[in-house]
Amino acid sequence: MKFVLLFGVLSLTLFSYSSAEMLDDFDQADEDELLSLIEKEEARAKECTPRFYDCSHDRHSCCRSELFKDVCTCFYPEGGDNEVCTCQQPKHLKYMEKAADKAKKFGGKIMKWFS
């Protein structure tokens, strides 16, 4: 009976130790993957396409405005057969940015009143 109990405790200890090492390996792999994704995103952010420039080569490369990312919009010019794609800001997002800017300015004025 003592042998079975000792064997059970020993196997449980070894199992928990191996599980902990496996979890550490998984955590390290997740951390490395996250760092590589962040580096790729930073590199991609440096190569963004400015507003009203051609984005037909990569439709997800448009730059961000203050709050929102611009959208690659494609259209056919009048009398033309070739599709033209440019980075543009949708009107509803433009209005939302203007409203947020005005709210920020108004909030600054209120803070000055109470200072």
Swiss-Prot record:
Molecular-function GO terms, alphabetical: toxin activity
Propeptide stretch(es), residue numbers: 21-44
Protein name in UniProt: U3-lycotoxin-Ls1e
Disulfide bonds: C48-C63, C55-C72, C62-C87, C74-C85
Transmembrane segments: none
Pfam families from the UniProt entry: Toxin_35
Family: Belongs to the neurotoxin 19 (CSTX) family. 01 subfamily.
Keyword presence, Secreted: yes
Example of a GO cellular component annotation carried by this entry: extracellular region
Keywords in alphabetical order: Disulfide bond, Knottin, Secreted, Signal, Toxin
Protein localization: Secreted
Signal peptide segment: 1-20
Matches recorded under PROSITE patterns: SPIDER_CSTX (PS60029)
